[in-house]
Amino acid sequence: MQFSKMHGLGNDFMVVDAVTQNVFFSPDMIRRLADRHQGVGFDQLLVVEPPYDPDLDFHYRIFNADGSEVAQCGNGARCFARFVRLKGLTNKREIRVSTANGRMVLTVNEDEQVRVNMGEPVFEPSLVPFRANKAEKTYIMRAAEQTVLCGVVSMGNPHCVIQVDDVATAPVETLGPLMESHERFPERANIGFMQVMNTEHIRLRVFERGAGETQACGSGACGAVAVGIQQGLLAAQVRVDLPGGRLDIAWKGPGNPLFMTGPATHVYDGFIHL
C-alpha cells in the first residue's frame, strides 16, 4: 500500500489514496500503524475515498491513532486538499468533499495555503453532544475537585474551551484527559486551553480526543475562536498561535460559516506491506 506522510503545523498524518488502491483498515491495524516506534507514526490516518455523491469530488475519512473513526479534522482537511492535487487525483483548486457528518469545501490558494470552510459552529448542547439543561455561553463544570469554567461548541466534533492566563503553564496533561472523558461529554471532547492576547490574537494548546496533546488542532482553533467570539472576547478575524505554528480564523457570527486558513506540508511518500 502506498501512502504519504504529511503534517499541518506539526499535527501529522498518514494519508492513503483509496480511490486507486483497495484498502481496509481495522482498528487494530490503525493502532499498529500509528505506533511511532514500530509503525509509521501519526496523530490521525486520513483516507481519500471516491465520492458518494456526483456533486462532490471525494469522501474524507479520519481515524485517530487509537483506531476510532471521527468526523472532523481541520488540519487534516488542509493536508487532504494538498494530497489529492499532489497525487493527480484532481487539478481543481476548490475541492468539495463529504465527511461522516456533512460536507466541506477546501480551497487551495496560489501560495498553497489551504482555506477550509468549516461550516457554522454549533452551540446547541444536544448537538455537540454535551449534557446541559440549556445553552449557555459559559458552563460551570467539576473535575477532580476543581471548578472549571468553559465554553462548548461543535465544529463537526465536540470542543470544550477553557480560558487560561498563560498557555505555557496550563494544566493540559492533567486537566485535559479528565475533561476529555467527562461524563457530560457522551462522545468525549477535544479540550482547548486558550490565552487571549487581544481581540485579534490568541494562543492555544489542545488536548485532542483519542490523541492527547498535539502540535496543532485545526478544528480546535476554530472552536476556540467561535467560543471567544460568542463570549464577546474576540473580533471576527483572529490569529491563532499553536505550538506548531499559526492559523488564521474568520467568522462573521451566527448564520455564517467559519473559515480556517493555514499550511499543509508533504513530508515523504512510502510503501508498506499490510
From Swiss-Prot:
<feature type="active site" description="Proton acceptor">
    <location>
        <position position="217"/>
    </location>
</feature>
<feature type="site" description="Could be important to modulate the pK values of the two catalytic cysteine residues">
    <location>
        <position position="159"/>
    </location>
</feature>
<dbReference type="GO" id="GO:0008837">
    <property type="term" value="F:diaminopimelate epimerase activity"/>
</dbReference>
<feature type="binding site">
    <location>
        <begin position="218"/>
        <end position="219"/>
    </location>
    <ligand>
        <name>substrate</name>
    </ligand>
</feature>
<keyword id="KW-0028">Amino-acid biosynthesis</keyword>
<comment type="function">
    <text>Catalyzes the stereoinversion of LL-2,6-diaminopimelate (L,L-DAP) to meso-diaminopimelate (meso-DAP), a precursor of L-lysine and an essential component of the bacterial peptidoglycan.</text>
</comment>
<dbReference type="InterPro" id="IPR018510">
    <property type="entry name" value="DAP_epimerase_AS"/>
</dbReference>
<feature type="binding site">
    <location>
        <position position="11"/>
    </location>
    <ligand>
        <name>substrate</name>
    </ligand>
</feature>
<dbReference type="GO" id="GO:0005829">
    <property type="term" value="C:cytosol"/>
</dbReference>
<protein>
    <recommendedName>
        <fullName>Diaminopimelate epimerase</fullName>
        <ecNumber>5.1.1.7</ecNumber>
    </recommendedName>
</protein>
<feature type="binding site">
    <location>
        <position position="44"/>
    </location>
    <ligand>
        <name>substrate</name>
    </ligand>
</feature>
<keyword id="KW-0413">Isomerase</keyword>
<dbReference type="GO" id="GO:0009089">
    <property type="term" value="P:lysine biosynthetic process via diaminopimelate"/>
</dbReference>
<keyword id="KW-0457">Lysine biosynthesis</keyword>
<dbReference type="InterPro" id="IPR001653">
    <property type="entry name" value="DAP_epimerase_DapF"/>
</dbReference>
<dbReference type="Pfam" id="PF01678">
    <property type="entry name" value="DAP_epimerase"/>
</dbReference>
<feature type="binding site">
    <location>
        <begin position="74"/>
        <end position="75"/>
    </location>
    <ligand>
        <name>substrate</name>
    </ligand>
</feature>
<feature type="site" description="Important for dimerization">
    <location>
        <position position="268"/>
    </location>
</feature>
<feature type="binding site">
    <location>
        <position position="157"/>
    </location>
    <ligand>
        <name>substrate</name>
    </ligand>
</feature>
<feature type="binding site">
    <location>
        <begin position="208"/>
        <end position="209"/>
    </location>
    <ligand>
        <name>substrate</name>
    </ligand>
</feature>
<keyword id="KW-0963">Cytoplasm</keyword>
<feature type="active site" description="Proton donor">
    <location>
        <position position="73"/>
    </location>
</feature>
<feature type="binding site">
    <location>
        <position position="64"/>
    </location>
    <ligand>
        <name>substrate</name>
    </ligand>
</feature>
<comment type="similarity">
    <text>Belongs to the diaminopimelate epimerase family.</text>
</comment>
<feature type="binding site">
    <location>
        <position position="190"/>
    </location>
    <ligand>
        <name>substrate</name>
    </ligand>
</feature>
<comment type="subunit">
    <text>Homodimer.</text>
</comment>
<comment type="pathway">
    <text>Amino-acid biosynthesis; L-lysine biosynthesis via DAP pathway; DL-2,6-diaminopimelate from LL-2,6-diaminopimelate: step 1/1.</text>
</comment>
<feature type="site" description="Could be important to modulate the pK values of the two catalytic cysteine residues">
    <location>
        <position position="208"/>
    </location>
</feature>
